[in-house]
Amino acid sequence: GRDRMRATMLSRLPEDLGGARVLDAGCGTGAMTAELAARGAIVTAADISPALIGIARERLPGSLQSAVRFVAGDMLSDDLGRFDFVVAMDSLIYYGITDILAAVGRLAARTDGCIAFTVPPKTALLSAMWTMGRLFPRSDRSPLMVPQDHRALTRATAGRIAHVARVSRGFYISDCLEHRA
């Protein structure tokens, strides 16, 4: 599922990213980062986890190292600079709608092209799992994903956020959305 979603998100960007500045917001282990750099982008790969940044750096082929700047820190920081494009795969899944809109707004203020991002869809199954998780909280669990109705995000932005596709494969289900300036 994640491979298909990555391909879906990449399809929103030009095939030739030669010289384009791209933020991989919440880059994780760097799979998207490597694909962006291989397509010619100048990538800023940001993640809050220094451990994941270390893994991403190690996995990146040597021939692509000069095209990537790794940053352990806030993916929304203005200090990261301006970008032509932003991708945020599974980076906003723990945010409520207000926080998603604020995050996308902050990114949009310094992005010239599209912002492709994912949210967990508001399906009956995910909503039930979310409710159960809230009823039985435990401190040793990851934060709960917050299912989103992509139509609410579209309405809240007067159509600047559009639904691209839903990817559902195995245990992975997510909606790809796109913000256009």
Please report, for each region that a protein language model flagged, where it lies by residue.
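A short, conserved alpha-helix within the catalytic core of class I
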Residues: 95-106
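A conserved beta-strand element that flanks and buttresses the S-adenosyl-L-methionine
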Residues: 87
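Short conserved loop adjoining the S-adenosyl-L-methionine
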Residues: 77-81
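Class I SAM-dependent methyltransferase SAM/SAH-binding core
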Residues: 29-74
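Conserved class I S-adenosyl-L-methionine
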Residues: 20-26
